[in-house]
Amino acid sequence: MRRLTLLLMLGLLGCGKAMPVDVFRSTTPAMDPIRFFTGHVRSWGVLEDRSGEPTSIVTTDCLGESDGDTLRMVQQLTIGRDAPTTRTWQMQRVGPNRYEATANDMVGTATGEASGRAFRWTWTLALSPGNDLKNVSMDQWWYLLDDGSMLNRTTVRKLGVILIEVTEHFAHVSS
């Protein structure tokens, strides 16, 4: 029943207006992004173009250190056969279930909110020099699963138009 409820809620994400994260408030386990990304975490996923066609495999390798309400994480991101890029995150809890973050390829500050097993945040990604799009909007939903792993769904937009969607599975790596 829990899976059916989660799948129905995920399905609502595809509908026009953004779903509020507090829809998930009564779900468990509770998502704490600082706790989740502390340690060694890897992801595997797929990047889809605007028509929903898979175009690339996405992998990340994340190493995070936390100190209470603060996380510093180095993320190696590989898309398809491209060379890996490094994103360095600084995340901070700024209130009950509220978070902010910066990263070396981010414009401004990411803002996010956790509720139950879900976390949603939005931020602006600065693309590499020479890319005509310059910046794109990132809308990320993270769902903590019963086994302690996480599902990520990211929608990348420019001027409100969906360019890319990414689905990833994140899991802790044993030492």
Sequence positions of predicted segments:
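Sec-dependent signal peptide recognition
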Residues: 2-7
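C-terminal motif of bacterial Sec signal peptides marking the signal peptidase cleavage site
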Residues: 11-14
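Bacterial signal peptide processing site
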Residues: 16-18
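N-terminal helix-cap/turn-to-beta initiation motif at the start of protein domains
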Residues: 24-40
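A short, Trp-centered hydrophobic/proline-enriched beta-strand micro-motif
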Residues: 37-45, 152
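Central antiparallel beta-sheet cores of small beta-barrel/beta-sandwich binding domains
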Residues: 44, 48-129
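Amphipathic hydrophobic-ligand
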Residues: 54-60, 133-138, 162-164
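Glycine-rich, aromatic-bearing surface loops/beta-hairpins
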Residues: 144-175
